[in-house]
Amino acid sequence: MVLMILPIIGSVSVSEGLVAIVTLCLVYMLMKYKHTEIPEGLKRLPGPKPLPIIGNVLEVYNNPHLSLTAMSERYGSVFQIQIGMRPVVVLSGNETVRQALIKQGEDFAGRPDLYSFKFINDGKSLAFSTDKAGVWRARRKLAMSALRSFATLEGTTPEYSCALEEHVCKEGEYLVKQLTSVMDVSGSFDPFRHIVVSVANVICGMCFGRRYSHDDQELLGLVNMSDEFGQVVGSGNPADFIPILRYLPNRTMKRFMDINDRFNNFVQKIVSEHYESYDKDNIRDITDSLIDHCEDRKLDENANIQVSDEKIVGIVNDLFGAGFDTISTALSWAVVYLVAYPEIQERLHQELKEKVGMIRTPRLSDKINLPLLEAFILEIFRHSSFLPFTIPHCTIKDTSLNGYFIPKDTCVFINQWQVNHDPELWKEPSSFNPDRFLSADGTELNKLEGEKVLVFGMDKRRCIGEAIGRNEVYLFLAILLQRLRFQEKPGHPLDMTPEYGLTMKHKRCQLKASMRPWGQEE
């Protein structure tokens, strides 16, 4: 998301432009002659030579995940590029990434002080915040406690093991009806369009305790806001890397700030309503759970760092935004892969038919008996690598990695796409093959292989909603596979070339779906 620098859109006078150019040149000259002392015994970071002002932007502008993967083959798993005026260290390779994020996790646990981060959730975002370690840990602990509490929240009826299972199963069943209805009317459907609304509904249910009809304007407004956010963030903000540009007119940045303001206001309204109706003995959703844990901390005299009520809004905002885009993108890719590999689709259906049957809806408890489905999900994560990079990291002190010196406050990119396609780690990485994650006889999931897949980050900055996200993808997909057969629409061949952005999505397409014999054994 931050690897692109686009032209500044807006009316800039000639005098303003000249002042900006002169200033940029002076800053560049100062930076050029600034010398970083390398401690004895350590090496200077390798990397391509940057151009004045713009750095290496032209070399990484198009498909940065591929450009930086090619650079890693030349410079190694630790190298440096320059985006605008900001040095950026790029990490590739499974061992190097694990060394940095797990064994040296404290050193790389920061977030860079990027200009655009200040406007996400009013600067209170848990994922993007540059808060000091103690404050960030307190907020992360609060969020994780709230998620654990929600994970054990009971459903409204005994047939569901938990609230999450109830939300996803009901919405998954409704999605099946929606797709069959659209097929009756139009003869084909856009998978992303319908999946994104269903996922948004589940997230609304989990975070806010609300479920909407699929044509509800408030729900569709949230979907549109998320799409706008992804487009704007995916195109990048030049001011993150050329500081002087933040003082010039920038329509893209104005739009970015407007989207954040609108969504913050929406979440603030719902959180305020939750405070008014909050009942400690009746926790309804994640927002209630956050309020509950926040109230407990206020009563704890031993709590060194208190989390303000307003930061609850930021945490809810993060959970909604991250879960919404990630899950909808993963599920949409899954349906496209099912169409591209019909023989795998039939194997998955047969597994569900044998282990679950065609009478009842799949449950979370069935997951352990569906190794092929779990392997399929892992291979979607690996092969599509729809999250090609983690949110940028930052070093919180001078450190070293693989013998190279990395100064404090250095921006760090983690190339997840490279790790997921590294020929030293995977056999035939360009091939889509779920069996790579199964035991030799195909009856068990190889968890050690599965742990190599990078999608949710690692260790201290690992996505806190990972467990919920994985379960959501599994349940949705199990229900769809059990009841529907997906096919390519004649005359509309699939194009699986990913489109780079905040999350990499497949090109929009039209597919067909037909009902399998539901409610009876085939």
From Swiss-Prot:
Binding annotation for heme: 463
Induction: By 3-methylcholanthrene (3MC).
A molecular function GO annotation: steroid 17-alpha-monooxygenase activity
GO CC term, one of those recorded: heterochromatin
Cell location: Endoplasmic reticulum membrane; Microsome membrane
InterPro entries in the record: Cyt_P450, Cyt_P450_CS, Cyt_P450_E_grp-I, Cyt_P450_E_grp-I_CYP1, Cyt_P450_sf
Residue positions binding substrate: 229
Tissue: Liver.
Cofactor field: heme
Claim: Metal-binding is one of the keywords in the record: yes
Keyword flag Secreted: no
Membrane topology: Peripheral membrane protein
Catalytic activity: an organic molecule + reduced [NADPH--hemoprotein reductase] + O2 = an alcohol + oxidized [NADPH--hemoprotein reductase] + H2O + H(+)
Function, in words: Cytochromes P450 are a group of heme-thiolate monooxygenases. They oxidize a variety of structurally unrelated compounds, including steroids, fatty acids, and xenobiotics.
Record-stated family: Belongs to the cytochrome P450 family.
Protein known as: Cytochrome P450 1A1
Organism field: Oncorhynchus mykiss
Source species taxonomy: Eukaryota, Metazoa, Chordata, Craniata, Vertebrata
